[in-house]
Amino acid sequence: MGMRRVTAWLVVVMLTAAAPVGAQTRDIGAMITEIKPGRGRIEVRGPGTPDWRPAGPLLALKVGDSLRATDDAAAVVVLAGRRGSVQVDAARSPFVVTAPPADTKLQKAFLLLEGGLGFLGSNPRETPRPVLSTRSMARPPVILSPRGGPVMSDALTFEWQGYQFARYALRVVAPSGIVLERSGLTGSRLAYPADAPPLVPGTAYTLQLFSGQSRVDEIRFEVVDRPRADDLRRDLREVDQALGPDVPASSRAVMQAGVLASRGFLHDARRVVVAALTTDADQPSLHALLGDLYARTGLPREADEAYEQARALADPARP
């Protein structure tokens, strides 16, 4: 069952949490980067509106919005500007989003954070109800990452999804011919070997996945040159400094991935999210962001599953 044919829980959350007509002119002042529902709920309302509505993961909060947590629920909110993060729990509710100081809006770190927040807030997320067919063992093998676009050469790992006990072959092809070929692969990932020919920045490579003699998936990617990679690393360091030392690890990962994705580095953004999930597997925002990345790279079924997981974790009581 595709994303267009299922109930879109997160879309409903985002729409019902919207402020009245005219609120679109308000600046984004914060974003929910973590949700811990516990036995309670995280709710939001716009300025001048009486009703509280459910707040979902990665919800962009406009200046003037109020956020509250009930019972033992809590949310982490990253603030625009160099203001770090705030944990909103019942004792700190309601929390009203304020505008960042005017003098921060010309700082590079502010603009970088705005780019990340803009990407994270621009994705219309559709979350299906649990569907057993999406987890069928009969699904075809598919390359998960990279899937087009630029990649950083120092973190290049090929990942795919296939049958549990099957063996696969990977081939990297340049315009001049085959650069790398590995067969008999089990598992689901292969780091680019250190003894393989170095990939040339700016060259369009084709990654092919084979099952037996059949090519089952194929994508293109490009390694960025060192100056561009160094610029990106410098920007990520500035974002880290702008967030401050007290931002929780998962929220930091969300913002780093948002900045990477806003610059087109979807492979590296996914790498950051997957790494964060190894230590915080129950965080709805990480699953929602993973769904965003899958949706943007042409993997609707994988996006469905990630959104489904985000929905279940953000609101365990919902059927």
What is each residue range found by the language model?
Residues 23-157, 232-233, 266:
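Flexible, surface-exposed loop/linker segments and immediately adjacent secondary-structure boundaries
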Residues 121, 126-246:
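Long, contiguous interaction/recruitment modules in multidomain scaffold/adaptor proteins
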